[in-house]
Each structure stands twice: as structure tokens, then as C-alpha cells.
């Protein structure tokens, strides 16, 4: 091979190698770009459509490392499509309740900027639990906290934090509200927020952070809602709302909401005479609520909601050990399932109960006349047998020497069953404690357990003499 041929051969080989390297670099670039954009798509096997991966739908981040020569590519694998909650699992079998959370808001207010609140409640999305309360537009160590005993002002807002995090200055104000309810349908939060004049209030329906619908007062007498979580089944959320007299006949309606839009309104039917401040829980395929009769009964009304056909029925808890305050003593009290007992029916307090076969679990103040102390127990036959009074598994949550307040239920879905939990509002300040000018609360939370448990008392615990006036 002469020198010219050698040069041509070497040149050809070099050109071939350069071409191959160039093509490899193009392939690497194409692969990189493809994988980069591919991470923002999910293939839905059900309808073979390409669905965008929204950040709110990502349950966990999984990183896959792919090596191509010296290039490292990070690819986020798309999670399964988020679905509506259906709450079809059975209710957990429990022996009682175990301590879960306590926020100590009043004690912390003695040395920090903590919101003045009342009407707290708890609700959970599929991953976390959150605490809510109606703020008074002020912190406790602030002169605006004077006279915060009043329920309805334009400054009240719905506050939301992770459970166990007190309502500090960085707390999110979800909406304007002096009455509220919240629930998560599996995809996003729904907040029902009532505010405005007593005779012409507005309920706003906020879904996924956006105002979707609203409704005005229908009886011009303090439109109000649950002050605890609503319930969503297969994308339909139900909320109980009342407008009318707090000590006489009122107009209660059950609203059915889908992604924030009111799709149906059903009037209350059945034998319940007065219904407000309901504590609701999923009882697949429907929703069941235990409410407050502020007119005729110290036994609690039951509202059963059929989510499929929008029908409503109502009655009263059968247990002769009744749940409202004020009430007669346990020897004298009664309940016969269908009607109010006409025993100290005027006034009352928000509370809860839930059925367990023929039995009923319930909570109530220890005092028969005031919001002091708190206890839970099970009544054998209390769901099905009129005036049943056999009590078992009693627990003291707050001893009788300390104040309590509202209480309500929330549900938590586990791997195999749905657990029932409750919170107790621990009110401090006015009217009873006149050294200070404010009224606020902390909370304590318990959940059902199938295990064993001990005893104790979990009051608010703040020394009123150490608190700002």
C-alpha cells in the first residue's frame, strides 16, 4: 500500500469513527430529552389516554437512575391515578380509646403568638390529619382578644394546620367563616364557610383552593353548619346545614356537593325535631350524623343520609344514658329512639356517638349541667333498644374539675378497617374565668383502639393567673 492509499484508508476510518460518535451523541441527546418529557406523563390503562401528572396527585417520589455512557438521567415514575374515597371498609372493632394528640394552645399562648379560637375540629386526607378552628382575627396576647366570647364577627376565619401544630402566626386562613365544615374527597379539600349578617349570611363552597359555589340564608336566622368534618363518598360530599331558631322550629337541609358544586339539596325528614351541629361519619354506602337538639331533647338526633338517591331519615339515639348537656341524671333520663325526650331540651352542646352493631359508643361532659369534665363509654343495646342503660368501658378524658366544651367525631381509614376518633374542645377564659377578657381553647384527641389502655385526665392545663389579661 503506497503512502496515498494509507492516508485515504486512515482518513476513511477516522471519518467513520467520527460519524459513529456523532450518531451516538445524537442518540444520547434524544434519549435524554425523551425521558425528561416522559416523566410528566402517565399512561392510564383504563382508557389508554395520556394523563398529566399533577403535583397534588404524587403520593411519593421514586427516583430511577439510568446510566448512558457518562450521562445520568433522573426519571420520576408517575404514581397511580388518585381516586375518590368510598369508605367501604368495615368499622374497626375497638375496646375503647387511646390518646392521640394535644396541642396545648392556651399554655403556649402565655409566651407566644397563638390565635384566639373556638369551634375546633379534626379531619384527615388520605395521608395526614389536620386540625381546624374558627379564629377570632387576633392572637391571645393582643388587645383585640378582648370580648372574643362572641360567636359571629366578620373577622373570624377558618384556620388549618397539621394535627398537633398550634395555630401560630404562620397558620393558613382557609376562608372567612364563623361556622364551617371541611372534608377531603380523596382528590382535594372541600371547605364550607359561613359568614355575613345573622339575617342574610352566605355559605361559600371552596374546593381545591377555589371558590366553586355559594348559597345564601334561606330562613334569615343564622345559617350555620356542622363545626366538624363533612363526609365524601365516591366524590359526593354531604353537609348538614340549619337556618332558623336555635330554640324552636328551624329549617335543616342536607346539601350534596361534587367538587365544590351543589348538585342537590334535601330537606330534613323523619322524626327529629331540631337538628344542628352534626357530627357525621361514613357508614357505607351512606353517611350517618349524630347531632344537637337545642329545643326539645337532651337525647341526640340521628340523621341518616342516602348518598345515591338523596333520601333522608332521622330519629334519636336509643340509649337512655343521653349525650347532651344539660340533662337529667342517669336514673331519671330516658330515650325511646324516635322522638325527643323533652328533658332539659333547651340549650345543649355539640357532641358525638357512633353505632357498633346494636350498641353505641358515645362521649359527653361529666357534669349534667355545665361543660365540665368529659367521659366516654359504650352502652349495650344503646343503638337498638329503647332506654337501654347498661354502660361498659367507661373512660375519663377530662376530670370533672376541669372545663371541656364541644366535641366531635372524625374517621381514619386503615389498611383493613375504618377507625373512629374524637376531639374535645377545652375552653378557657370568659365567661367562667373573669380574670381575663378573652375566650379561647385548646384540644385533646383520642382514637379507637383494639388494645388495652390505662387511665388519666388531659385538661387544658393552663394556669389562668399566668395568662395575659
Swiss-Prot record:
GO terms for biological process: carbohydrate metabolic process; viral budding from plasma membrane. GO terms for molecular function: exo-alpha-sialidase activity; metal ion binding. One of its GO terms (cellular component) is host cell plasma membrane. The active site is at 151 (proton donor/acceptor), 406 (nucleophile). The influenza A genome consist of 8 RNA segments. Genetic variation of hemagglutinin and/or neuraminidase genes results in the emergence of new influenza strains. The mechanism of variation can be the result of point mutations or the result of genetic reassortment between segments of two different strains. Ca(2+) binds at residues 293, 297, 324. Catalyzes the removal of terminal sialic acid residues from viral and cellular glycoconjugates. Cleaves off the terminal sialic acids on the glycosylated HA during virus budding to facilitate virus release. Additionally helps virus spread through the circulation by further removing sialic acids from the cell surface. These cleavages prevent self-aggregation and ensure the efficient spread of the progeny virus from cell to cell. Otherwise, infection would be limited to one round of replication. The chain crosses the membrane at residues 10-30. It holds the Pfam family Neur. Its EC number is 3.2.1.18. Inhibited by the neuraminidase inhibitors zanamivir (Relenza) and oseltamivir (Tamiflu). These drugs interfere with the release of progeny virus from infected cells and are effective against all influenza strains. Resistance to neuraminidase inhibitors is quite rare. This is Neuraminidase. Belongs to the glycosyl hydrolase 34 family. Its cofactor is Ca(2+). Intact N-terminus is essential for virion morphogenesis. Possesses two apical sorting signals, one in the ectodomain, which is likely to be a glycan, and the other in the transmembrane domain. The transmembrane domain also plays a role in lipid raft association. It comes from the Viruses. Residues 31-469 are virion surface. Residues 36-88 are annotated as: Hypervariable stalk region. It catalyses: Hydrolysis of alpha-(2->3)-, alpha-(2->6)-, alpha-(2->8)- glycosidic linkages of terminal sialic acid residues in oligosaccharides, glycoproteins, glycolipids, colominic acid and synthetic substrates. Disulfide bonds join 92-417, 124-129, 183-230, 232-237, 278-291, 280-289, 318-337, 421-447. Glycans are attached at residues 61, 70, 86, 146, 200, 234, 402. It is a single-pass type II membrane protein. It is found in: Virion membrane; Host apical cell membrane. Residues 11-33 are annotated as: Involved in apical transport and lipid raft association. Residues 91-469 are annotated as: Head of neuraminidase.
Amino acid at each position: 500500500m503506497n503512502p496515498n492509499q494509507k492516508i485515504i484508508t486512515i482518513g476513511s476510518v477516522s471519518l467513520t469513527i467520527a460519524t459513529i460518535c456523532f450518531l451516538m451523541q445524537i442518540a444520547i441527546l434524544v434519549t435524554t430529552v425523551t425521558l425528561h418529557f416522559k416523566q410528566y406523563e402517565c399512561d392510564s390503562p383504563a382508557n389508554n389516554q395520556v394523563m398529566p401528572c399533577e403535583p397534588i396527585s404524587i403520593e411519593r417520589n421514586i427516583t430511577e437512575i439510568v446510566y448512558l455512557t457518562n450521562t445520568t438521567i433522573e426519571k420520576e415514575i408517575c404514581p397511580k391515578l388518585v381516586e375518590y374515597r368510598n369508605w367501604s371498609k368495615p368499622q374497626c372493632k375497638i375496646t375503647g380509646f387511646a390518646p392521640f394528640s394535644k396541642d396545648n394552645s392556651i399554655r403556649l399562648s402565655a409566651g407566644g403568638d397563638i390565635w384566639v379560637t373556638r369551634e375546633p375540629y379534626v379531619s384527615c386526607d388520605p395521608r395526614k390529619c389536620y386540625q381546624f378552628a374558627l379564629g377570632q382575627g387576633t392572637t391571645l396576647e393582643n388587645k383585640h382578644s378582648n370580648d372574643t366570647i362572641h360567636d359571629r364577627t366578620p373577622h373570624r376565619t377558618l384556620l388549618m394546620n397539621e394535627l398537633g401544630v398550634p395555630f401560630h402566626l404562620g397558620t393558613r386562613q382557609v376562608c372567612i367563616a364563623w361556622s364551617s365544615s371541611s372534608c377531603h374527597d380523596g382528590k382535594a379539600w372541600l371547605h364550607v364557610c359561613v359568614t355575613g349578617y345573622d339575617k342574610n349570611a352566605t355559605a361559600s363552597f371552596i374546593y381545591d383552593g377555589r371558590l366553586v359555589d355559594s348559597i345564601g340564608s334561606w330562613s334569615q336566622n343564622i345559617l350555620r353548619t356542622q363545626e366538624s368534618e363533612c363526609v365524601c363518598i365516591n366524590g359526593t360530599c354531604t353537609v348538614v346545614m340549619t337556618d332558623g331558631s336555635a330554640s324552636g322550629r328551624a329549617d335543616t337541609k342536607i346539601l350534596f356537593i361534587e367538587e365544590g358544586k351543589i348538585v342537590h339539596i334535601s330537606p330534613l325528614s323523619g322524626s327529629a325535631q331540631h337538628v344542628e351541629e352534626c357530627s357525621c361519619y361514613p357508614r357505607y354506602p351512606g353517611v350517618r350524623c349524630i347531632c344537637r337538639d337545642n329545643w326539645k331533647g337532651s337525647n341526640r338526633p340521628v340523621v341518616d343520609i342516602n348518598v345515591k338517591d338523596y333520601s333522608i331519615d332521622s330519629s334519636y339515639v336509643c340509649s337512655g344514658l343521653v349525650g347532651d348537656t344539660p340533662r337529667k341524671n342517669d336514673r331519671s333520663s330516658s330515650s325511646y329512639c324516635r322522638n325527643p325526650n323533652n328533658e332539659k331540651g333547651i340549650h345543649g352542646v355539640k357532641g358525638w356517638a357512633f353505632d357498633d352493631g346494636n350498641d353505641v359508643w358515645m362521649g359527653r361532659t361529666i357534669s349534667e349541667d355545665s361543660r365540665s369534665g368529659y367521659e366516654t363509654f359504650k352502652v349495650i343495646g344503646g343503638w337498638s333498644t329503647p332506654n337501654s342503660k347498661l354502660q361498659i368501658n367507661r373512660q375519663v378524658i377530662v376530670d370533672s374539675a376541669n372545663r371541656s366544651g364541644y366535641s366531635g367525631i372524625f374517621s381514619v381509614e386503615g389498611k383493613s378497617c375504618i377507625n373512629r376518633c374524637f376531639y374535645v374542645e377545652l375552653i378557657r377564659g370568659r365567661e367562667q374565668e373573669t380574670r381575663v377578657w378573652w375566650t379561647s381553647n385548646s384540644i385533646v384527641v383520642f382514637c379507637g383502639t383494639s388494645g388495652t389502655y390505662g387511665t388519666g385526665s388531659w385538661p387544658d392545663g393552663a394556669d389562668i393567673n399566668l395568662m395575659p389579661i
